[in-house]
């Protein structure tokens, strides 16, 4: 019978390890050395800021720090201290980074804090450099611009499930004294607005769960390559005061910064940094289903197409059944100037001008020609009304929906003439 086991000797182990050390080829590092020319990628302003006169010579080069961070992301090590331990036991990685001696973790942290803005400019420069490469890979997909928001969860105690369980116990204690208090809904109001150790980590509802995170916008192309990341921090809110925060006691409706509210400021900053970039197709979710956003995408950011699903909440349709006595309103036609006509005798509707409520798109309001002012409202005097409303039939026209027919001014009106 064949022996399935073999005797392992210390000599064989030593021989195998020695052979592996002598024969291994770090091909990945060789590829990086061959194709990664950091001197041509790092902006000149970054060099000047790093090597400016400080009273003593730099022990570590700028390229060494950049290589350290790139290698850290390639390997997938989150903590700087763990990455330094890895370098301490691997000569090849130290040689790749160019460290004659290893810096401590505090030195790495100070570098990121002191040169945060320059690191951002470095990545912005990479976007400009990689854009032609993306176009060469797939011209069609590289011409897509995809926008979405996310939350970067911070490793704070408030994100630990134990923290929530403690607050839930407090809520249940309140429920014992007040039976009308719902502990599972009320616990949300007991949670602090920000994390104790990091005020940038705010309590918000993201991706179906609550957490303490820094909300951010991510812009990618159709290839999935990131083009821009914008944190919704205090600096961003100060630059764009139109971004309003909201905080409620209900996690189902709480939104720190809405997706549609953040779209215009983020895209404005993106194209300001990259004025030579242009895209024809915008892709986003149904939260961008707004006529104001369609107008901004087309005329401010010069998109030719906007792929945004219709939001059912923005499309109110009157539902009837066979047993309902309510009839479906007759369709309304329009004249050559875009004025709606009465479905019974083609009489032009009466224009009441522009109508724009809070957080609503600009629209033109038309009312039934037989609707008369009566006190605080209007009263329909039609003998055969086409609606059950005592106000009379109303038609709203969104100019951005058909910019050719409604170019900001109603055709055929006194203002047009």
Which residues are covered by each model-predicted region?
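Charged, often Cys/His-bearing segments associated with DNA-binding zinc-finger transcription factors
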Residues: 1-46, 388
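An anionic, glycine-rich sequence signature occurring as long contiguous blocks
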Residues: 2-4, 300, 307-309, 317-417
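DNA-recognition alpha helix
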Residues: 80-96
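Polybasic low-complexity intrinsically disordered regions
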Residues: 114-286, 291-299, 311
């Amino acid at each position: 019978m064949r022996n399935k086991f073999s005797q392992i000797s210390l000599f064989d182990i030593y021989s195998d390890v020695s052979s592996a050390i002598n024969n291994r080829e770090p091909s990945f590092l060789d590829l990086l050395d061959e194709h990664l020319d950091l001197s041509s990628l790092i902006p000149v302003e970054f060099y000047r800021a790093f090597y400016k006169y400080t009273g003593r010579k730099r022990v570590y080069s700028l390229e060494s720090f950049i290589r350290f961070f790139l290698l850290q992301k390639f390997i997938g090590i989150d903590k700087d201290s763990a990455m330094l331990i890895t370098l301490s036991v691997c000569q090849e990685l130290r040689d790749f980074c160019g460290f004659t001696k290893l810096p401590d973790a505090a030195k790495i942290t100070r570098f990121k804090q002191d040169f945060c803005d320059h690191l951002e400019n470095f990545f912005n420069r990479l976007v400009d450099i990689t854009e032609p490469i993306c176009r060469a890979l797939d011209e069609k997909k590289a011409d897509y611009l995809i926008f979405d928001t996310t939350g970067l969860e911070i490793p704070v105690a408030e994100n630990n499930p134990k923290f929530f369980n403690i607050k839930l116990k407090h809520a249940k204690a309140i429920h014992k004294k007040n039976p009308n208090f719902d502990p599972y809904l009320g616990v949300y109001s007991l949670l602090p607005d920000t994390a104790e150790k990091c005020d940038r980590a705010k309590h918000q509802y993201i991706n179906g769960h609550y957490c303490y995170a820094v909300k951010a916008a991510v812009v990618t192309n159709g290839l999935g390559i990131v083009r821009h990341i914008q944190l919704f921090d205090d600096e961003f809110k100060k630059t764009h005061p139109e971004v309003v925060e909201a905080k409620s006691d209900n996690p189902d409706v709480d939104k720190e910064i809405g997706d549609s509210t953040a779209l215009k400021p983020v895209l404005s900053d993106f194209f300001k940094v990259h004025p030579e970039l242009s895209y024809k197709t915008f892709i986003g979710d149904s939260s961008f289903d707004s006529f104001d956003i369609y107008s901004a995408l087309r005329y401010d950011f010069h998109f030719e197409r906007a792929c945004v699903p219709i939001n059912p909440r923005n499309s109110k349709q009157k539902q009837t059944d066979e047993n309902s006595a309510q009839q479906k309103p007759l369709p309304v036609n329009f004249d050559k100037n875009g004025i709606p006509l009465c479905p019974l005798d083609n009489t032009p509707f009466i224009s009441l001008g522009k109508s724009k409520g809070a957080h609503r798109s600009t629209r033109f309001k038309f009312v039934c020609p037989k609707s008369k002012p009566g006190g605080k409202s209007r009263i329909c005097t039609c003998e055969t009304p086409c609606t059950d409303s005592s106000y009379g039939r109303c038609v709203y026209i969104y100019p951005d929906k058909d910019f050719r027919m409604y170019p900001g001014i109603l055709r055929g009106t006194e203002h047009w003439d």
